[in-house]
Amino acid sequence: TVYKADRVVCSLPLPVMRYIKFDPYLPSVMAKGIALVPYFPMTQVHLVAKEPFWEADGWSPDMWTDTVAGHVIANRHNVDNTDVTSLTAWARGFTALQLDQVSPEEGKAWVISEFERIRPSAKGKLEAPQIKSWLRDPFANGDYAVWEPGQVTEFLYAVGQPHGNIHFCGEHT
C-alpha cells in the first residue's frame, strides 16, 4: 500500500519502521538507528479473580515475582477506583521470551499455575481471558527501546529529526 500526504507525523516504534520504504531514503545514521536499536520483550496476561483471594491470605493483590507471572498489578477500573476489577501479570525480558515460546493458551495456563504455586489462596480462583505479546505484535515489535552501549550517542538525535515533511515522535525520540 502507498500513502501520500503533504505532511506526516510518524509515531511508529523503530522496529515497525523497518518495514516502511521511505522516499526519499532516510539519512544513513537514522536508517541505521531504526535498523539496530532493539526493543524490550514484554508479554501481559490479563487475569480475572473469581473471588478476592487476597482477603483470605491478607496480602496485597500486587506482587513482584521471579516467575513468568512477573510483576502483578491489581487494576481498579470501577466507579470509585477502590475494588480490584482485574489483575495484569507483566512478564518482561527473559520471562516474556519464555511465554512467547508457547501457545497463548499454554502461556495463560503457565502464568496461572505459577501464580497459584506462589500464592496458594488463588488456587482455582483465576481466569486468564487475554494474553498480549508486544514482541509478537507486528505494530509494536516490543515494548520500548533498549539502547545498547553507544547507541544513545550515535542514534538518539538522528531518529528524532524531521525528514523532509515527515516528523518523528515517540518514546525513542
Enumerate the language-model features and the residues they cover.
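Short coil/turn segments at beta-strand junctions that form active-site/ligand-binding loops
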Residues: A5-D6, G164
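A conserved short coil-to-beta-strand element within the FAD-binding core of flavoproteins
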Residues: T1
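Conserved flavin/dinucleotide-binding core of flavoenzymes
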Residues: S11, I20, P41, E55-T173
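Central beta-strand plus flanking loop segment that forms part of the substrate or channel wall
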Residues: V29-G58
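Glycine-rich, flexible loop/turn motifs
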Residues: V16-R18, F22, G33, K50, ...
